[in-house]
Amino acid sequence: MLELHRVSKSFNGRTVLSDIHLTLENSRRTAIVGPSGSGKTTLLRLIAGFETPDTGVITLNGQTLCDNGFSVPAHQRRIGYVPQDGALFPHLCIADNIAFGLKGSKAEKQKRVDELMALVSLPTHLQKHSPHEISGGQQQRVALARALAQRPALMLLDEPFSALDTGLRAATRKAVMDVLQQANVASILVTHDQGEALSFADRVVVMREGQLSQSGSPWALYHQPNSEDIATFLGETLILNAQIDGGKADCLLGRIAVDRPTANGRVRIMLRPEQITIQDTEITSTAHMRATIRNVEFSGFVSTLTLRIHNAEADVIELKTVSHAAFIVGQQVSLSVNGAAHVFSQ
């Protein structure tokens, strides 16, 4: 269990982290997500022992790592660290990179290297290759194997997939998840990629301006964010004014269900694009609302539609939808809402 209590950090008089409270107990994979400058990498460096907090206490499995000026050195914390670029030693071969820091006889080290190469699914013939002779995805697997060599209690991943192209990023992320699960090592991933955080973790922590804004399961954060800022940060969204009465909300899209039917009065509600079905009016005659397409931005799998809602004065909305039909400007469409809209707390 990792615990942070009242942790703060400043650099040159500028506060980077402020009064951080965080407990990671049951979660095996945690993602800390936030925009650039939110303090997430600094938080990771404090946990790793590369920096010392100005105030606060950090403990791991009951051991105090830092408190009131006292700090356990990074190499004694049993914490693995994989940086963004892998940081492999260019003058060492793959096997020597993985074995770096291992104690024991040459045979014992080689046995451990063989085990780790198999664990991260790297062929044995790469052991004598130099880092520049293998792909970016393979380099990240070597960095992970090197971090696992010391049998850490916790693995820290500092945006390790950001330098990879899209297809390789997803494949490498899945491979890393599988390896960490097989090794039974808890992990914390720092990323600015919302989709990466939601798909990697079973607990997500959102950071904004040096503070923790919200934490919970990926599903809860995506569907029930605490604020409009978090809602828009975590994915495409449609936020509307609404009036709740009788357990339902009257809004631009008609009368729809909400996740807080006990709320009353004027509120702000949120829908995700996948909750809204868009169909040609010739296909269906039943819908909450009708609209005219004003603009279409096609980008392959997804199209962004600008819609003018009928019976509403100058109300125009933008929606992303799967490009299952060839939408055209001027087309009349019907809109229907699936599931409940999320009601923001006032």
From Swiss-Prot:
Keywords: ATP-binding, Cell inner membrane, Cell membrane, Ion transport, Iron, Iron transport, Membrane, Nucleotide-binding, Translocase, Transport. Transmembrane segments: none annotated. It is an enzyme of class 7 (translocase). PROSITE patterns: ABC_TRANSPORTER_1, ABC_TRANSPORTER_2, FBPC. Part of the ABC transporter complex FbpABC involved in Fe(3+) ions import. Responsible for energy coupling to the transport system. The complex is composed of two ATP-binding proteins (FbpC), two transmembrane proteins (FbpB) and a solute-binding protein (FbpA). This is Fe(3+) ions import ATP-binding protein FbpC 2. It catalyses: Fe(3+)(out) + ATP + H2O = Fe(3+)(in) + ADP + phosphate + H(+). ATP binds at residues 34-41. One of its GO terms (cellular component) is ATP-binding cassette (ABC) transporter complex. It comes from the Bacteria. Residues 2-234 form the ABC transporter domain. It is found in: Cell inner membrane. Its EC number is 7.2.2.7. CDD domains: ABC_Carb_Solutes_like. The keyword Nucleotide-binding applies. One of its GO terms (molecular function) is ATP binding. It is a peripheral membrane protein. Pfam families: ABC_tran, TOBE_2. It comes from Pectobacterium atrosepticum (strain SCRI 1043 / ATCC BAA-672). Belongs to the ABC transporter superfamily. Fe(3+) ion importer (TC 3.A.1.10) family.
